[in-house]
């Protein structure tokens, strides 16, 4: 199975920095994920958008824990959206959901054709 390298793009809106994640979150994703979080400096909150993530392994979970730790140190709440049912369950089992708000798809703001919030 071929895995797609993670692409992480940061967008800002109304005090929230949204990190749009695309591809696989595994050991190779550390640089992209860390750099994207670095771009959230000054935001009131962080939204991790998993809508285009295909795969997360245990190392990827550890990288997400690292982002949660950085956000906690920065006193910024983190939310996640776009998780498949499978990864929603994984986040509950690993207790990641205890440290971030998991948004249902209905709670996600509507997007335009480019994927930006309307």
Question: Could you describe each region identified by the protein language model?
Answer:
Residues 1-55, 66-118:
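STAS-like cytosolic regulatory interaction modules
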């Amino acid at each position: 199975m071929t895995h797609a390298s993670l692409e992480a793009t940061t967008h800002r809106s109304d005090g929230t920095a949204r990190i749009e994640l695309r591809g696989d979150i595994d050991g190779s994703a550390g640089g992209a994920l860390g750099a994207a979080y670095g771009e959230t400096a000054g935001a009131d909150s962080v939204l991790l958008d998993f809508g285009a993530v295909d795969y997360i392994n245990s190392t990827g979970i550890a990288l997400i824990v690292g982002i949660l730790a950085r956000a906690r140190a920065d006193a910024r709440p983190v939310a996640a959206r776009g998780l498949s049912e499978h990864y929603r369950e994984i986040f509950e089992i690993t207790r990641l959901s205890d440290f971030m708000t998991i948004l249902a798809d209905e709670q996600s703001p509507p997007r335009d054709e480019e994927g930006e919030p309307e």
